[in-house]
Amino acid sequence: MTLNNVARPDLCVSYKKIAPPKGLYSATPSISGVVNQSMPMAAIFLRNKFIAWFSLIQSVHYYLNTDEDIIVAYKENKAPSPMDQPPAIKLFMSLIGLCVCYMNLVFPQQIAQPSSSGSKGNTETTIETTTEVETETAKQ
């Protein structure tokens, strides 16, 4: 038998799962967490559809890539940071931001027309008052 024979039982090694090491930045909040937390609110205030879709995609990405240790910490009410929100809340906020941006399709708002008669009357009155004062000073 050759040494490279795969069928030999002494060459078989069972698989042992090894957890990857924690990264340098895993314990500290990153800039993506700040952006992920503030984008849904920016979409709500600005009613910008691009920002709303961006926040939804980013929240789904954060939700799918959240570490299991962080989820367990949230369930035990031991969040890594007091300002950090659970991934489900971030996803819910981005969905609300998207709904607010498209709310005009369900509840359209009428644009107020400027009244043309009110502004002309005020302008004419001001001109007449000015000419009356000028004529009175010219007579004296």
Curated annotation (Swiss-Prot):
Q: Where is the composition biased (Polar residues)?
A: 113-122
Per UniProt, subcellular location reads as: Endoplasmic reticulum membrane
Q: What is its main location?
A: endoplasmic reticulum
Which intervals of the chain are annotated as region Disordered? 113-140
UniProt topology in membrane: Single-pass membrane protein
List of glycosylated residues: N36
Give the signal peptide range: none
Query: Which regions are flagged for Acidic residues bias?
Result: 131-140
* Membrane-spanning parts: 91-107
- Source organism's superkingdom? Eukaryota
**What is one cellular component GO term in this UniProt entry?**
endoplasmic reticulum membrane
Keywords tagged on the record: Endoplasmic reticulum, Glycoprotein, Membrane, Transmembrane, Transmembrane helix
Q: Reply yes or no: does the keyword Transmembrane helix apply.
A: yes
Q: What else is known?
A: Present with 2140 molecules/cell in log phase SD medium.
What name does the UniProt record give this protein?
Uncharacterized protein YPR063C
This chain's source organism reads Saccharomyces cerevisiae (strain ATCC 204508 / S288c)
